[in-house]
Amino acid sequence: MAGLFFSHSFLPVWGPFGIGKHAAVIGPIKGKTFLEVGFGSGHSINYLVQKGARKVYGVDISKTKLDFAAELNKVPITKGKVELFEKPMEKRLKLEPIDTVFSIYGFGWTIDPKKTLANIYSYLKPGGQFIWSWDNSVFSVIHEEAGKLVVSGSYHEEREFIAKKWKGVPVYLKYRKTATWFRLLRDAGFMVDDYMEPAPIMKKDLTATYYTIRKAERIPCSAIWICIKPK
């Protein structure tokens, strides 16, 4: 299914409906080092290189996505400015201390958030930041049906499930409340510096019942977390 996500939601955008004024949350780029968790087609990596990043690493579990990203970033890879890893985010990488780890709708797929957060924490310099976006937890339990917003599950009921609407391919997901994400980040040692729930700027439906603009205009679609590794 990697082709479904080719060039979707990459820097400076953080979610499916666009982010607007929140595009600059990545902070200074020139001369900095970055790691993208779940690099997809590699467009965010290319964006950072073009903006003067010293080095950009990327990790993704998909060989197809790695091929996409490697082709797009062929020149900076040969110059040693980009290095890609085909591994699960739960596996520890050997990396120099880096300035910023980020993930655009990638980190939320982890099957072991404690292990993944421990990895991310270890990669960062003291004072480094982890910035990531994911579906807002409230958005996840509401769908649109016949023009009305319908609560399709309990916000309080955290659950694992297999989604079967991805062209017939079963996909594992786990729904977590915002409070749970906060505790996971805190317990990993991070300080949550900011939390954003931006309004949409792209005014069109992306799916028939889930990513609809009427829903996104009333309920925040994306959540963006800015987390700091204390000095």
Report residues per predicted region.
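Conserved alpha-helix/loop element of class I SAM-dependent methyltransferases that forms part
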Residues: 2-30
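Class I SAM-dependent methyltransferase SAM/SAH-binding core
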Residues: 35, 41-91
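A short acidic, Gly/Pro-enriched loop at the edge of an enzyme's catalytic core
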Residues: 93-101
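A short SAM/SAH-binding and catalytic strip from SAM-dependent methyltransferases
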Residues: 100-113
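A short glycine-rich, Lys/Arg-flanked "PGG" loop and its adjoining helix->strand segment in the class I
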Residues: 114-126
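Conserved class I S-adenosyl-L-methionine
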Residues: 131-160
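Short alpha-helix
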Residues: 172-195
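C-terminal lobe and adjacent flexible extensions of AdoMet/dcAdoMet transferase-like proteins
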Residues: 188-231
